[in-house]
Structure formats: structure tokens, C-alpha cells
Amino acid sequence: MGKRLAMIVTLLVLALLAAPGAKAEGVKRALVMGFDTFQSQPSTTPSSANNVTLMANALSGGSMNLYQLVTHLDDLATTEAFAQAVQEAFDGATDEDINYFYISTHGVWQEGMSNGALQLLLSDGTNEGSITAWEMRRIFDAVPGTKVLLIDACRSGAMLGKGVHGPLENVFQGDDYKVLCSSGGAEESWFWAGETGDGLRSGAGYFSGALVNGITPRGSYGADVNDDGEITLHEMINYLLENHGASTPQVYPEEDDFVLFTYDADSFTGRRREAAMEGISFDSVVLTGDSPRLDFHFTMLRPVQVIYQLVYFGPNGWQFETSQFIYDNAERYGIYGDQPGVLSPGVKERSLSLNELDSDDYGYVLVQILTREQDKLTVQTSRVICVPPSTGDPLMEALVPASFSPETGQELTLVVHHQYPCELTIWVDDAEGNTVRRLTSRRATRPQQLRPLGTTISWNGKLRDGSMAPEGTYRFRIRANIGSEVYELISPTFTLLSPQG
């Protein structure tokens, strides 16, 4: 018999009782669901189950003050059951409310399909079904308020028209949607699974683990860059892009200051940390093929095992099946005896040498720093290391849509094909050749599984000062740095339209 679990938790109902004359604030509700058992795809047990637990705890923590939290695990197999779960979880919502939705499952989509046809698989443990991005939009459109969608599934970025060759529509375009996807439309979204010392199954999604690290004490609220107790959508995507390397997270809207998560920053002190490690910093994520040595440092807060995982990128993607695991044995014969990888508290400086690149002198390497404590494995960070060749024309090509209208919520996605790993700088120039915005500055590329190889980046139509660019004709100016060589490309022009344009 398949697993069936539906739990409803009502939290802090008293928070809804405003003092006389006080301004009423929006109510927060959350629906968290995961699926591990499938007919057409491999089982992910127990990763989605653990993702559900992690996300439920994260969303009900801090100072979120959720009114209601509903979780589902392997107990929905039809679009109708999904719609009913959404209706029940967000029943009573108003236009002022914030509605959180998280899902962990398999995503099914491929180039040539409409991105609205992307499927997220559903299951009740025995029967399997699916829901398309279009159907999700229709169901959530009936929910008043702001909808925050957190999607951990392969190719999920396709629903935003991101991480694909495009141009494709954004299924969730609109002021009332805030969306984070674990991967671009051409990418897998990875999870890990294993066994503990006592034979129990363990595992979780890499994206979900990074997301939880960013918004909980487990990761010292790492996404809150300015330590103000508010983690915005913009802060969250920046944190994920830096600390989650197995896929390329996608966001809508870009550069949005909507507050996703809150916590009491004043009460979070250094006296008692849940995190085992903090302050992870890499000297550079761009290395040279003739000397691929990675230097980094971090601070241990308590003694735990530290393990480095190196995953090389090959023709078919990340080669997790042949990844290297390296215990940090610098202190093996210290006060912790001969237990491999245990480090004492304090600042640590380390170096790793990389090899097995996909060519003689260039490629991508995923470096993950893991800690093991009481047989519990945690991914502390996951960084993509870019190793460009020492020389070589990347043969760049730029693809852009003909037009977009940012004041209606549209964003324009640029696709840059480049044959080699490199550092990209991208400017937006107007028709007179004046630069109105710089989108990136020597940003290291990362594999997005595009064919031909390449990078996607989106522009929301805003200028340096945050105001909207005027209607008119624009183009991208693109520079690729490979070693000491510089290559430049001007994209085709595109038109920024007014809402009536």
C-alpha cells in the first residue's frame, strides 16, 4: 500500500488578533508536498520525504508566524486531487495574504514542447499522474494574494522560459507570483540518497538543502546578506547561485525585493550556533588549466567530519557516479584520534588540486563541502569551478527575442552560445550606443546543459538606478575573457515596448 499522509497544522492563531486600531497584516499559509514513488521514473526515496520535513520546519520557523501549514507526501495522483489540496490549504486567503507552495518531484519537459506543457509528476504510492505548468497557473490563479512557488524538479525553469534556448513565455508572469525553480529548463535537479550506519535510508535534494541553509539557523541564515532579519527574493537567488552548483536556480521576478522569509535577527547570536561550519570563502571560482589549484577557507564551530566531494562535468552532465570523496585529514592524528576528517573549531585554510577535466586543460568541476555529524550528512556549500582554456575563440552567438514589455511583467532572456568555459561581461546599450545597464562583470560561466553550449541571462528592463528603461531599441554587448584573450560580440537589436506598444 502506498504512503498516505496529509497533515494540517494551525500555528499561532493568536497572531491574527490585531490590537484595536492596529493595521492588519496579511496572513501567511503554506502547502508543502513531495513525491518519492513513481511508475515511470526512478524512486527518490527518501529524498522528497526529507525535503518535505526540512521545508515544513523552515517555513514554520523564524518569525514567519504561519497561520496554517499543510503537508502532503505520496498521497496525490490526479490534477483534481492537487487542485483540492491547494483549495483546502489556502481556503480563506485574501488579497493581502502570502501563500507559500513547495513541491519536490520529477519534472518532465524537453526542447520542442511548449513550456506550459511541462509536467510535475504526482503519485499516491500506487498510481501516478501529473500536473502541467498551465494547470498549476489556472489553479493558483483562483487563490487570492501573493503566491510564492518553490519548485524542486528537473527542468522546472522551463515554466519561466529560463535556462532554455527560447524564446518561451513565462507561465507565471504577473505581479502576484514569486517563483524559485531549482534548475533551468535543460537541466536535471539532483538529489542524494544513502544509508546511515544503522542501515536507515537518508537523502535530500541539493537545491532544497541549500534553500533551507539560507533561511534557517542550520546555515546561519546565510541568505540574509545584510543581517536585517528579512530575506528577499533577490537575496535568496544570489545565495542559491553561490551555494548550489548542481543545477542553475531560476527566479521570477529578477532583482525583486519581496520579503520571502523573516526571523528575529536580534535574538540570533553567536552564543549557540546550529551550524557546524560558517564563513566558507573561495579565493576564486575561476582557475587555469595549467595550475588548477583551489584555495579556500572556512570556520569550524564544533568538531565534525569534513569531506570534500569533486564532481567533474562530462558530455552527459555532472558525473556523480564517478565523483571523488576526500576526507580532510589535516588533523587526523590530533585530539580526535584517527577518525578521518574530524576538524577542531577554528579558522581553516585549505587547497585542493583538480584533475580529470573534460579536455586537456578546461572544463567545470563541482566542489561540495560536506559535514558528517552523528551519521547525518549535510551539504554546507556547492560551488561550480570554471576552468577556461588557456587560449581559444569561444565562437559566441547571441539569441534574443524581437521585443518585450517589462511594465507588464515580461523579462527578456538572452542566450549566449560559447564553446568553452569563460568569464562573461554583458552590457545593455541603447540605439545610440550608450550603455544603460551592466548585467554581469566577468561572471564565471556554469554548465546549463544547453545544446549548443551556452549561458542564459534575463533582463527586467530596469536601469542602473532601478527605474524602467524608456521605450526604444536596445542591444546587448557581450565580452568573453579566456585567459589573457578577450572576445566581443554585439547581439541583434530588440525593442522595449510600453504596455500599449
Language model feature labels by segment:
Residues 8-17:
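Bacterial N-terminal signal peptides
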Residues 24-284, 295-297, 302:
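Cysteine endopeptidase catalytic domains of the caspase/legumain-like
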Residues 102, 307-311, 425-429:
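Beta-strand signatures of extracellular beta-sandwich domains
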Residues 114-116, 129, 199, 223-233, ...:
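Acidic, glycine-anchored loop motifs typical of Ca2+
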Residues 294-300, 412-418, 459:
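Aromatic/hydrophobic beta-strand junction motif of beta-rich domains
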Residues 321-358, 435-469:
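Glycine-centered tight-turn motifs at strand-turn-strand junctions
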Residues 348, 362-368, 472-478:
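A short tyrosine-centered beta-strand micro-motif
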Residues 369-415, 475-501:
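C-terminal tail/sorting-segment detector
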